[in-house]
């Protein structure tokens, strides 16, 4: 039986690149790229990606187990499915990326970088996702991009909705609620993420899922992500999810991107600051020539603080809380 992760890590294609089981047909489309199509009829085309950052191993392990169970017939398949391991060379080396962050390159932004394996990979992933969605006229398109964060978080499991000018899918929102996310963040401007690409270019209902903190293979406590794992299994098998057992999600929207625009940029937060740390109005957060930032709202929460990004890139985001009723859903 095909071992998706092991073959991807080997750097060599499988000897057999397509086959079928009692429930499905599968095809290897390239390194870390696999389609699975059920014999039965389906109404959804679903993309699940992991490993866009090579050191984010928990989502890779979760996705690989999902593929293993589908191919073994232990889990029925009810959707047309594309699974992707985003950056295999970085996964092999246990690094976030080798040259540049692929998750800043989508939507054609890779063309603005020095050509590398990672710019070529971003292009390949775009082409494969567009071709996958264009090849079927299913009524619903979904994309979940699985990640873990560099640092800890007051909300260990959270989602990020890409900016879009149309309302978000109500079905996707219900699924996100039922997989017991702690928080949901709404972007308010376009970006170079994989989820933004599939939303904007493919009209997919897309979301980036953050599952705890990045750890090496074998050190993840996957039990803390059991609701998300069950959610993915429910999604691909079209089975019901149990009702949410934890407290309601918290909702945030982005109000400021903290850009590092000068070599003397300083991010005035402690090195051990965790995601969703709160700061009061007037707090000085960034300093650089001609552009300091102080908290403008009564309270703002910081997400992804990282003062070491390259010039021109985002060193963090500032959020404000919002009500569920403020989220545009159709």
Swiss-Prot record:
Record's catalysed reaction(s): N-succinyl-L-glutamate + H2O = L-glutamate + succinate
PANTHER family listed in its UniProt record: ASPARTOACYLASE (PTHR15162), SUCCINYLGLUTAMATE DESUCCINYLASE (PTHR15162:SF7)
Cofactor binding, per record: Binds 1 zinc ion per subunit.
GO molecular function: hydrolase activity, acting on carbon-nitrogen (but not peptide) bonds, in linear amides; hydrolase activity, acting on ester bonds; succinylglutamate desuccinylase activity; zinc ion binding
Location of the active site: 210
Pathway membership, UniProt: Amino-acid degradation; L-arginine degradation via AST pathway; L-glutamate and succinate from L-arginine: step 5/5
Entry keywords, A to Z: Arginine metabolism, Hydrolase, Metal-binding, Zinc
Function: Transforms N(2)-succinylglutamate into succinate and glutamate.
Family matches, as HAMAP family: Arg_catab_AstE
Gene (UniProt): astE
Cofactor: Zn(2+)
Classification via SUPFAM superfamilies: Zn-dependent exopeptidases
The name this protein goes by in its record: Succinylglutamate desuccinylase
UniProt lineage: Bacteria, Pseudomonadati, Pseudomonadota, Gammaproteobacteria, Enterobacterales
Binding site for Zn(2+): 53, 56, 147
Enzyme category, top tier: hydrolase
InterPro entries in alphabetical order: AspA/AstE_fam, AstE_AspA_cat, Aste_AspA_hybrid_dom, SuccinylGlu_desuccinylase
Documented EC number(s): 3.5.1.96
Entry's family note: Belongs to the AspA/AstE family. Succinylglutamate desuccinylase subfamily.
Amino-acid biosynthesis found in the keyword field: no
Superkingdom: Bacteria
């Amino acid at each position: 039986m095909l071992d998706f992760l092991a073959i991807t890590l080997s750097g060599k294609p499988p000897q057999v690149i397509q086959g079928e089981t009692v429930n499905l047909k599968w095809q290897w489309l390239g390194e870390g790229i696999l389609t699975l199509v059920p014999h039965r009829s389906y109404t959804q085309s679903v993309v699940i990606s992991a490993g866009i950052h090579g050191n984010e191993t928990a989502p890779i392990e979760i996705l690989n187990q999902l593929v293993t169970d589908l191919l073994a017939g232990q889990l029925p398949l009810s959707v047309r499915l594309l699974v992707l391991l985003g950056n295999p060379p970085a996964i092999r080396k246990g690094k976030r990326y080798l040259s540049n962050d692929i998750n800043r390159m989508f939507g054609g932004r890779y063309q603005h970088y020095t050509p590398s394996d990672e710019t070529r990979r971003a292009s390949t992933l775009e082409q494969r996702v567009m071709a996958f969605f264009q090849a079927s006229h299913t009524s619903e398109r979904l994309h979940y991009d699985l990640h873990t964060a560099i640092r800890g978080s007051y909300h260990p499991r959270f989602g990020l909705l890409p900016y879009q000018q149309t309302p978000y899918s109500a079905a996707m929102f219900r699924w996100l609620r039922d997989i017991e996310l702690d928080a949901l963040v709404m972007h308010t401007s376009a970006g170079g993420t994989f989820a933004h690409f599939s939303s904007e270019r493919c009209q997919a209902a897309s979301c980036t899922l953050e599952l705890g903190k990045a750890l090496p293979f074998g050190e993840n406590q996957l039990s803390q992500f059991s609701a998300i794992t069950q959610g993915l299994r429910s999604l691909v098998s079209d089975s019901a999810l149990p009702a949410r057992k934890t407290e309601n999600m918290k909702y945030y929207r982005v109000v400021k991107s903290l850009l590092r625009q000068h070599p003397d940029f300083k991010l005035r937060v402690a090195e051990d600051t965790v995601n969703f740390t709160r700061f009061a109005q007037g707090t000085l957060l960034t300093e650089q020539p001609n552009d300091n930032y102080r908290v403008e709202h009564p309270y703002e929460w910081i997400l992804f603080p990282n003062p070491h990004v390259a010039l021109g890139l985002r060193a963090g985001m500032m959020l404000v809380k919002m009500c569920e009723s403020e989220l545009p859903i159709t």
